[in-house]
């Protein structure tokens, strides 16, 4: 990793413009993502997340410091790597930054998206919204970031604040405020809800979440994401107790119920 960082000091994308001093702490990248935004997308997974979602499938991204596999990369380096796959982005594809929580590295994200838009690249953020506040310095940076962001995938984990805290360790007031702000500025959003039996699958909460979503004027799509255990091994590798050991994925009936109540999937509401 040290060698990579030192080599990066001599990287240039333009003979007259040295590499940005801003670096992102990168966990990994995926060249052909098909589930995190429209079209085929280059996915950047960044480090750092304050929430501790009990079903998280990327707990290895929680730490801002990362581990021996973590690399520091400039926006130029990431964009250069992503643009190798631009020929696959003809149907609305582009770059999605996920994590971890991308908004914890907002300076890096802003610079990356500025450069991406200069190249005509579609930009998307996959976020749970936890860092959001209408206070500066974050808010002014976020407002600027939105000028270069085409779409946000916003994970609303629970509408009930106590249940949200049980899932993540935090309440959801600022996250719902972020959703409302994005509606105010007309920024396109896909709402996502991870459906976990006995944790985020309650009819009354699904109905309340739907009522909240209906107050927003910018929601293009709602997605129900059924709980799975594909990331459980990461918890074990990190020596962290997995508290959903006895929780099974939701049944087909409960998935259908959630889709219907949230106007998602085949029940997508028109107009």
Regions found by a protein language model. Give the residues of each.
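N-terminal [4Fe-4S]-dependent radical SAM core
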Residues: 2, 9-72, 84-91
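Auxiliary Fe-S-binding modules of radical SAM enzymes
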Residues: 4-35, 80, 190, 195-271
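Generic domain-boundary/flexible-linker signal
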Residues: 37, 55, 64, 106, ...
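Short glycine-enriched, charge-decorated loop/helix-capping segments at active-site entrances
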Residues: 61-63, 67-69, 165-171, 239-247
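N-terminal pre-catalytic segment of deacetylase/amide-hydrolase enzymes
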Residues: 70, 77-80
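Conserved AdoMet/S-adenosylmethionine-binding subsite of the radical SAM
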Residues: 79-87, 91-94, 99, 103-225, ...
């Amino acid at each position: 990793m040290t060698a990579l960082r030192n080599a990066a000091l001599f990287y240039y994308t333009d003979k007259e413009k040295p590499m940005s001093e801003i670096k992102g702490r990168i966990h990994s990248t995926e060249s052909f993502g098909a589930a995190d935004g429209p079209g085929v997308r280059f996915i950047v997974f960044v480090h750092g997340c304050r929430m501790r979602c009990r079903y998280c499938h990327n707990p290895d991204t929680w730490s801002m410091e990362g581990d021996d596999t973590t690399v520091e990369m400039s926006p130029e380096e990431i964009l250069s790597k992503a643009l190798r796959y631009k020929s696959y982005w003809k149907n609305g594809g582009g770059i999605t930054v996920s994590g971890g929580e991308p908004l914890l590295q907002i300076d890096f994200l802003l610079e990356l998206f500025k450069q991406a838009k200069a190249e005509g690249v579609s930009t998307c953020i996959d976020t749970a919204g936890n860092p959001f506040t209408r206070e500066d310095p974050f808010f002014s940076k976020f407002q600027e970031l939105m000028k270069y962001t085409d779409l946000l995938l916003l994970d609303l984990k629970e509408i009930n604040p106590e249940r949200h805290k049980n899932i993540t360790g935090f309440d959801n007031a600022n996250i719902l405020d972020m959703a409302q702000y994005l509606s105010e500025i007309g920024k396109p959003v896909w709402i996502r809800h991870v459906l976990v039996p006995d944790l985020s699958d309650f009819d009354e909460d699904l109905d309340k979440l739907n009522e909240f979503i209906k107050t927003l004027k910018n929601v293009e799509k709602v997605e129900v994401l059924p709980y799975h255990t594909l990331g459980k091994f990461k918890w074990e590798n990190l020596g962290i107790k997995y508290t959903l050991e006895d929780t099974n994925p939701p049944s087909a009936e409960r998935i259908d119920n959630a889709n219907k109540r949230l106007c998602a999937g085949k029940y997508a509401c028109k107009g």
